[in-house]
Each structure stands twice: as structure tokens, then as C-alpha cells.
Design a protein with these regions (language model features):
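Non-heme Fe(II)/2-oxoglutarate
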Residues: 4-94, 106
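Eukaryotic intrinsically disordered and solvent-exposed regulatory patches
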Residues: 17-19, 132-133, 201-202
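Extracellular/periplasmic catalytic domains that process cell-envelope and extracellular macromolecules
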Residues: 24-26, 137-142, 187
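Short coil/turn segments at secondary-structure boundaries
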Residues: 45-46, 120, 208-209
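A short coil-to-beta-strand element that immediately follows conserved catalytic motifs
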Residues: 94-106, 159-160
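Short, conserved beta-strand element in jelly-roll/cupin
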Residues: 107-110, 126-156, 219
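Histidine-centered catalytic micro-motifs
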Residues: 114-122
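Catalytic core of Fe(II)/2-oxoglutarate
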Residues: 142, 151-224
Length: 224
């Protein structure tokens, strides 16, 4: 059964991450890496027709449908393990000797629309959702976000939109991006991995007009 475990448990499954990648995350709050996951077509085929559900948030905030996957999910399971193992390498860039891997990862599918600016560590404003967030370490404990894009090979951000917009250099606690000193739009190129600091980088998914598929993993601060 899937459970929260130290990311080091999956270190052997992680793709090779260089010291330069770790240094870039530490200095810039994000890093973009291409070519680490050669099995994108296989993953897309396994996830494209799966059942997805609405989130608990309003479609005025986000329009994606999601499903959760674990290391026990067939073809996808190996990639889930690989994403969980990334935390062991990147932990020093977010100020920890080690971080914990979540029990599950999230697949987000957009047919159209996007996701308003937010922090992955930001509590929701709705009271009921806030208490759910507060009681869930897998939400309130996030320190590191890793996103693997599984878009179609001919997805073109210039035509279809769907970029991940990162608001960089923000003051602590800014979930809106208003204090950003720079903005970076990352195209959802298939096989591209984006890693950023969950508590430092407000971000948004810009509107897409074509199906956009991504697999996300949130690493957690270790329990005190």
C-alpha cells in the first residue's frame, strides 16, 4: 500500500540529476530539464483515456480534471518511483538534508482553460477546504514541486497556449505573483521536467485550447 516514505527509498529509481541542476534550483528557485524520461509516449497512452475527476475547486480557478497514481499503477508506476526519487537529490536546494516522498502523484488533464496563479503550499480561502489542507501533510507539507509533461508531440504552445508561468523573486508569502521581479513561461514540451520550490514560486497554467497532460509530484518537509 502506498505511503509517505523518505525520498531516499526511491533514490535508485531516479534519473540522473547533475550538480548543476541542483545549483540552478537553489539559486533560481526552479530548473527545467529535458530528455530524462524517454517513455513519454507509453505514459501518455496509459493515461490519456483513464478516468479523471473534477477537483474540489471552482472552475473559475482551475479547469483541469485529475486522477491520482501510485508506484503500483503498472506502466506509470516506474515513473512515479522515479519522480519520488528526485527529492533525494534536490533536498539540499530547499534547505533539507532529506525530504519525504508523497504516497501518490497527480495526473492533470486540461481540455481547455487553465489554472489561476497560486502557490502549491498556499492554503485555500474556503474554510472547509482550509481544514482539509491543514490536516493533510501531503498538502500543507509541500516544499518541492516536480512536473513531467506528457503532451502530444505536435503540441505547440505558440498555437495552443498552455505554458506554465512562473513568478520569480517574490517576497515570502506572496501567492499572487505581484511582487515578482521576473516571469518565466515554460512550454509544456513532452518529456520536459520542471522542478521548483513549492513555497517560493507562485505559478499559473495559461489557457490552453488543446489537451494538455502532466504528471506532478510534491515532496514534503520531513517530520520534526
Amino acid at each position: 500500500m502506498a505511503a509517505i516514505r523518505p525520498s531516499s527509498c526511491y533514490a535508485a529509481d531516479a534519473p540522473p540529476i547533475s550538480n548543476a541542476h541542483v545549483a540552478a534550483l537553489e539559486a533560481d528557485d526552479y530548473v527545467v530539464i529535458d530528455g530524462l524520461f524517454p517513455n513519454v509516449d507509453e505514459l501518455r497512452a496509459a493515461l490519456d483515456d483513464a478516468q479523471y475527476r473534477k477537483t474540489m475547486q471552482s472552475e473559475a480557478i482551475r479547469t483541469d480534471r485529475v486522477r491520482w497514481v501510485t508506484e503500483e499503477d503498472g506502466v506509470v508506476g516506474d515513473t512515479v518511483r522515479a519522480l519520488k526519487g528526485l527529492g533525494d537529490r534536490f533536498a539540499p536546494a530547499v534547505g533539507y538534508e532529506c525530504v519525504d516522498a508523497p504516497s501518490k502523484c497527480m495526473v492533470a488533464r486540461y481540455e481547455q482553460g487553465g489554472y489561476r496563479t497560486h502557490l502549491d503550499h498556499d492554503p485555500p480561502s474556503d474554510d472547509d477546504l482550509y481544514w482539509l489542507w491543514k490536516s493533510s501533510r501531503e498538502q500543507s507539507g509541500r516544499v518541492l514541486t516536480a512536473i513531467l509533461y506528457l503532451t502530444d508531440p505536435d503540441f505547440d504552445a505558440c498555437l495552443h497556449g498552455g505554458c506554465l508561468r512562473l513568478f520569480l523573486g517574490c517576497t515570502d508569502g506572496d501567492a499572487s505573483g505581484e511582487t515578482a521581479t521576473s516571469i518565466r513561461d515554460v512550454e509544456p514540451v513532452p518529456g520536459r521536467l520542471v522542478v521548483f520550490k513549492s513555497r517560493r514560486v507562485p505559478h499559473a497554467v495559461l489557457d490552453t485550447s488543446r489537451r494538455r497532460l502532466a504528471l506532478s509530484c510534491w515532496h514534503l518537509a520531513p517530520e520534526a
